A protein has these predicted regions:
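RNase H-like two-metal-ion nuclease catalytic core shared by retroviral integrases
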Residues: 73-75, 95-117, 128
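Extended, low-complexity cationic-aromatic segments
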Residues: 1-54, 157
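Acidic/histidine-rich, metal-coordinating catalytic segments
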Residues: 67-79
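RNase H-like polynucleotidyl transferase catalytic core
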Residues: 11-20, 89-106, 122-124
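Short, basic/hydrophobic alpha-helical segments
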Residues: 50-70
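C-terminal anion-handling pockets and recognition modules
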Residues: 108-157
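Short, aromatic/basic amphipathic alpha-helical patches
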Residues: 81-89
Length: 157
């Protein structure tokens, strides 16, 4: 069971050490609509430019083309190049955060809650288990916040 909660004191069941990732790691591309309070994400094997552009394409399809989308981004070089090439023709604009200032991004608070509910104290043997837990959390979070009907909710379908 992942996440954390209060429990009686007893001898805890220890988690195995995961210093080496034999199955590799996965990347969560997250999008947060601040107006509708809607959080969505897509998990990919890599964070390369083509994966980022695929997520941007899916994001653009959620909103009408007349609506300008401002995307707050960190300073990852793959993000900058992909955005520079993709955004001008799709009525989107990148807003880059200052270096070491990710706390300015509103999505970081949402990622903290996601981490506490799904990843903290977890010991998953397969990526599919972790993926399904993250997607289940995102669906439940949007349902409890009443943001299942926002345009960005189509991203998860």
């Amino acid at each position: 069971m992942a996440g954390w909660c209060w429990a009686r004191r007893r001898k805890p069941q220890r988690l195995r050490a995961t210093y080496t990732r034999r199955c590799g790691i996965e990347q969560l591309h997250g999008f947060y609509d601040v107006h509708a309070d809607c959080l969505v994400g897509r998990i990919r094997k890599r964070k390369k430019a083509r994966d980022i552009v695929a997520c941007f394409t899916q994001l653009r399809a959620c909103y009408p083309i007349q609506l300008r989308i401002y995307v707050v981004m960190d300073n990852l070089s793959a993000n900058q190049r992909a955005a520079k090439d993709f955004f001008p023709g799709h009525n989107m604009e990148a807003v880059y955060l200052p270096t070491d200032a990710s706390w300015l991004n509103a999505i970081e608070c949402e990622f903290t809650a996601l981490h506490a509910a799904t990843l903290k104290n977890s010991d998953d043997r397969a990526h599919q288990i972790r993926r399904s837990r993250i997607y289940r959390y995102l669906r439940r979070r949007n349902r409890t916040h009443g943001s299942t009907r926002c345009s960005l909710a189509r991203f998860m379908r």
